[in-house]
UniProtKB/Swiss-Prot annotation:
Descriptive protein name: Non-structural maintenance of chromosomes element 4 homolog A
Keywords for the protein's UniProt record, in alphabetical order: Chromosome, DNA damage, DNA recombination, DNA repair, Nucleus, Phosphoprotein, Telomere
List of residues that carry Phosphothreonine: 345
Residues carrying Phosphoserine: 377
Gene: NSMCE4A
The keyword DNA damage appears for this protein: yes
Annotated compartments: Nucleus; Chromosome, Telomere
GO cellular component, one term: nucleoplasm
Protein family: Belongs to the NSE4 family.
Pfam family, one: Nse4_C
InterPro entries named in the record: Nse4/EID, Nse4_C, Nse4_Nse3-bd
Biased composition (Acidic residues): 56-68
Organism: Homo sapiens
Keyword DNA damage (UniProt): yes
Amino acid sequence: MSGDSSGRGPEGRGRGRDPHRDRTRSRSRSRSPLSPRSRRGSARERREAPERPSLEDTEPSDSGDEMMDPASLEAEADQGLCRQIRHQYRALINSVQQNREDILNAGDKLTEVLEEANTLFNEVSRAREAVLDAHFLVLASDLGKEKAKQLRSDLSSFDMLRYVETLLTHMGVNPLEAEELIRDEDSPDFEFIVYDSWKITGRTAENTFNKTHTFHFLLGSIYGECPVPKPRVDRPRKVPVIQEERAMPAQLRRMEESHQEATEKEVERILGLLQTYFREDPDTPMSFFDFVVDPHSFPRTVENIFHVSFIIRDGFARIRLDQDRLPVIEPVSINEENEGFEHNTQVRNQGIIALSYRDWEEIVKTFEISEPVITPSQRQQKPSA
């Protein structure tokens, strides 16, 4: 039994072991120790590295290797391309900085470098590569500025000696002979050269200028005859116009005088009617509206009020209020008028009231006026007839 038990002991222990625990121990033994730096990794690699699929999501293949995600493969390819572009940009910038003098002296070296940078810029898709491209453009602009400064700025300057040599050659004079003649200014050949040279120069310069036409007068006629002056026509004097203008004020004055005379006659006639009424019945006052209102004509009523105002102004009549607070009119006697002038107590007022057509109708209806007291004169009856 002991032998069996001892014989079964190892097998029993082997069967009683946990298989999951044995696999975990074997994996822990097979792992190699990692340094802290390798365990942490850089922050950039942790950001750029795609998420690894878990063991539960992946299915083991026949070979035992895990399947890779296509998105992670594409991201790694893009990172490799961007890394290569940055490397090429840095190499190009270093080359430009080292070969600065050669680029400034060579003719097309700067153009070639710019074309190479344009080729790299077509592949730029991130900000890091764009920053390198901007840095290269700063260097290229500085080089272009220096090459522009090296250009000659005196291209339009005037070379006097060259111009004189060309001018003497055009005149047919040898510059060496002309120099000897200039030294000897007293020789007659010098005067001939100077005079003849200016003559040739003048004929040459004449072809480059437009000729100015001579000035001549244009009389406006083909035959050149002067126009015959027209005879002066004397305008008639404006004497008749002045006479007519002088006659118009006289006519107006006569019309004004005639209207004034007619007004005075009408005022005297109305005053006579008022005095006749009071002479017949001196104790009964005359109502102002009964006296001036014409029930058949509103314009005549207005004229009567206008004429009565002159009678009141001159002091031949007066207006007062009766017991019913209605206006009445009565003539002023001669004795009262004389007393007023002596004591200087008479007040002159011109009684004019505003009267509308509606007021006139209401007065006629209220006072029951059927016939006018102031009958129209013959002058007023003619237009109506």
